[in-house]
């Protein structure tokens, strides 16, 4: 999990391979390569506060998904594993709740522990989402067919939460269902759930996707408590398909007209990913429009490569997102892009920030795998998986040196001349404040505080093999954003 390396950028993106010894964010499938070059960054004073440090016992290991916050200030999230045994993460993952105490600390409660692939799933990798009644919904690997599940957790009056599997994905034996749901879910106003699977959907003629290149799906609740799935769109890549992308890793997002927007990590003409739009039509089907196909070095200037995270919309209908690599910055450390909506329905892409690598301090971030959020002033906030070495070219995770830095939290502010100014709110440094923030986006409360998770780092705990390890943290960045008006 914690062996970190420099990424390499290649046109044939099938898996994200870390060549310095590192763990891949969220089991990504892309291949990115990055070189270390001098860069200059602007740093703001750190405002990070660690709310909870995972101990590697029964409280969870590797909080890969982000957190959501309820009206009482409780935080909810998932961990990929349960505990540390003989020096390695084991168990099938869990869903947790963090409750603030009068002392200002947070107390953890495990809401559900997954039992394994053929039971109720395993290894949740995304955040959860609330419905209006206070139930939680999420996705996990495994299930009866090994393609993943969608689950519901309902609170009971006496305290425990009850799990119900509302869908088992099955992309095998002629089924055109999706497989491997990695992103989080979203609700519409009618209580339907929407999400993506990174594989599946049929498409057996596709050159690169044995069981399909991924899907966008909908789950509709029935009166008897069951849910009915429908595939809104199945992605294709080659073999006579439309080459509209493959491997959607994150959730989709609605605009005010009910259209859905999302990204694919790979696929498209240059196999560097796409941004797509799905429009509902009266027949109940959805029509796909490709808004942008990433080309990176083929374009001048380069436009980025491999968007793992989804997009966020501003009030004008413009889209913003991140790419793992490319972008034309020194070393190609990734990019933040904007797709501007035109009067003719077309979108024009511009790169509003190019991440650059610094051999002397690694000050800028690299690999912005996480999604963005926008505050009421139009500022953008996100994370980078690596980078941010400050004046020290090395940070430590469990005694291992991470030469590029252990990740950053950044802010992009629009300026009067149409450009964007970058500042860094925090650089993860060592085994106290966490490291390697995961691809899920940050969460913002009404006061402008930001919340997120780092899959590694935190206080060192002695494991059963006698070594010392860290298992990740939940953090807060105080007062970073402009509160909603």
List each model region and its residues.
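Extracellular beta-propeller repeat domains
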Residues: 2-485
């Amino acid at each position: 999990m914690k062996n970190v390396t420099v990424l390499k950028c290649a046109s044939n993106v099938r898996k994200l391979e870390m060549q310095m010894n590192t763990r891949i964010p969220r089991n990504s499938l892309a291949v990115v390569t990055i070189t270390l070059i001098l860069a200059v960054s602007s740093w703001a004073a750190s405002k990070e506060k660690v709310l909870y440090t995972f101990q590697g016992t029964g409280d969870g290991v590797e909080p890969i998904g982000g957190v959501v916050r309820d009206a009482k200030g409780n935080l909810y999230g998932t961990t990929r594993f349960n505990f540390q045994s003989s020096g390695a993460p084991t168990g099938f993952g869990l869903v947790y709740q963090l409750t603030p105490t009068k002392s200002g600390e947070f107390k953890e409660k495990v809401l559900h522990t997954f039992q394994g692939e053929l039971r109720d799933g395993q290894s949740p990798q995304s955040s959860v989402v609330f419905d209006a009644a206070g139930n939680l919904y999420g996705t996990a690997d495994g299930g009866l067919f090994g393609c993943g599940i969608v689950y519901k957790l309902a609170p009971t009056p006496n305290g425990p939460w009850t799990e119900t599997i509302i869908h088992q994905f099955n992309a095998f034996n002629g089924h055109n269902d999706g497989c491997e749901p990695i992103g989080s879910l979203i609700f519409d106003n009618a209580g339907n759930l929407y999400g993506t699977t990174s594989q599946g959907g049929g498409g057996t003629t596709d050159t690169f996707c044995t069981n399909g290149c991924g899907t966008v799906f909908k789950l509709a609740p029935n009166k008897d408590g069951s849910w009915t799935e429908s595939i809104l769109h199945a992605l294709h890549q080659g073999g006579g398909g439309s080459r509209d992308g493959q491997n959607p890793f994150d959730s989709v997002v609605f605009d005010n007209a009910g259209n859905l927007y999302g990204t694919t990590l790979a696929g498209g003409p240059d196999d560097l990913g796409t941004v797509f739009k799905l429009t509902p039509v009266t027949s109940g089907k959805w029509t796909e429009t490709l808004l942008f196909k990433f080309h990176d070095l083929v374009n001048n200037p380069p436009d980025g490569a491999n968007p793992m995270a989804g997009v966020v919309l501003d009030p004008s209908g413009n889209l913003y997102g991140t790419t793992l690599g490319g972008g034309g910055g020194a070393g190609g450390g990734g990019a933040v892009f904007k797709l501007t909506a035109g009067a003719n329905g077309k979108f024009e892409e511009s790169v509003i920030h190019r991440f650059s690598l610094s051999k002397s301090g690694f000050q800028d971030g690299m690999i912005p795998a996480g999604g963005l959020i926008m505050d009421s002033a139009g500022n953008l906030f996100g994370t980078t998986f690596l980078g941010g070495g400050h004046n020290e070219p090395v940070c430590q995770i469990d005694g291992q040196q991470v030469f590029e830095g252990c990740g950053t939290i950044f802010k992009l502010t629009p300026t009067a001349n149409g450009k964007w100014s970058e500042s860094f709110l925090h650089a993860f440094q060592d085994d106290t404040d966490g490291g390697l923030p995961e691809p899920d986006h940050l969460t913002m409360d009404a006061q402008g505080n930001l919340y997120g998770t780092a899959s590694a780092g935190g206080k060192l705990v002695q494991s059963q093999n006698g070594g010392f390890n860290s298992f990740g943290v939940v953090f807060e960045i105080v007062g970073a954003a402009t509160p909603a008006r």
